[in-house]
Amino acid sequence: MRMQDIERKVIEWLDQHSAKAIRLLKRLIGEKSTLGSEFNAQAVVLEKLRQFHMDIDVWEPSIKQLKQHPYFKSNRSDFHESPNIVAKKTGAGGGRSLILNGHIDVVPEGSVKDWKYEPYQAVEENGKIYGRGSTDMKGGNTALLFALEALHACDVKLKGDVLFQSVVDEECGGAGTLSAIMRGYRADGALIPEPTNMKLFIKQQGSMWFRITVKGLSAHGGTRYEGVSAIEKSMHVITAIQELEKVRNARISDPLYDNIPIPVPVNIGTISGGAWPSSVADRVVIEGRCGIAPHEKPEAVKLELENWLKDLEYHDEWFKRHPVQVEWFGAQWLPNDLPDDHPLISVLQSAYQKMKQTEPIIEASPWGTDGGLLYHAGDTPVIVFGPGETKTAHQANEYIEVEAMIESAKIIALFVMDWCGLHTDGEDADAQVNKE
């Protein structure tokens, strides 16, 4: 059978069985998989994978082993009942291997009052499925599994190996993917179906969390002039951070960031301080996220922020005597930069063009993924492409469009066949003749 005929057969199967993908996504959304609660959602993934006759590896990442790796950054103390899953379909040989990586963990739902429907009810309405994780990224995971199911149902034989990974902890720094790398899983390329709105992200921003402590001097609120308000001093710190963000982003000239207003944000996420309404606050803690451009090293970015805040002492004597304290904690996502001429791009472009009859948009991501770990720790080049829009991720009323999810599954199926290569019955016959 010609490659075009095989591709047509796979696409027709996906069209005819779209209800399977919808049911799977609803089941995945229905299993809440926030930090430490991933077990039941992974059980759904495992049940599906067992239908594909793949070699399956299930394990709980080891904190002891992970702590030995320099890229391990996580707040977790253990991964009890938070298993990783890797399923491998061994190819016939002679093709390129591929990792299909998706994270099963989701961020908390926040206030249920802000939701149109229950966050884990998975309601379908007007071509959209609502629920926490629908876009980030159970819709993408469903697209991967649906593509694999089509290849299995159509008895497609590949030359290269395919490794499907359903990992934990991406939202907290990527310990699940790092554990898979340390377990030996690598490939010639990888695709992560994060919500890119069907764009190809060939460069990914990294990020890391910081904590800044600002000191003050406590006093009675009635005589506040005898104290020094850490809250007021923290306003100077925040202004300095905002100025640094402008300086850092002014350096970005990569055209792939042209449509992103702030390519590498420095976001302030939490502020806490003060102990009593009638007291002058003697301490404020600011926590946030600092973006890392694809070409930057995390250590250099850390040093720049620390030195920038150290300069406050030249403008305020208080900071000279009480310098702000900066620490880096919790999660970190490494940046990633795929060369413009890498075959991952051209092969995915070709698959996209076959389905959409138009050129895909190529951009850089405004957020980090596990792609940085796959590349820097696993020596595996990565491209990010998937259904869903970032604007709904991490928000109330998160949703994904069913049509985009099905369409992305088709593109991914075509991509897998082209990247790994098709092994035909004729090649089996030729191999047998040569053997005899």
Swiss-Prot record:
Domain of life of the source: Bacteria
Active-site residues, Swiss-Prot/TrEMBL: 105, 170 (proton acceptor)
Cofactor note text: Binds 2 Zn(2+) or Co(2+) ions per subunit.
Listed Pfam families: M20_dimer, Peptidase_M20
Covalent S-S links between cysteines: none
Cofactor: Zn(2+); Co(2+)
An MF annotation (GO) of this entry: hydrolase activity
Keywords: Cobalt, Hydrolase, Metal-binding, Zinc
Top EC class, one word: hydrolase
PANTHER family: ACETYLORNITHINE DEACETYLASE, PEPTIDASE M20 DIMERISATION DOMAIN-CONTAINING PROTEIN
Stated family: Belongs to the peptidase M20A family.
Full protein name: Uncharacterized metallohydrolase YodQ
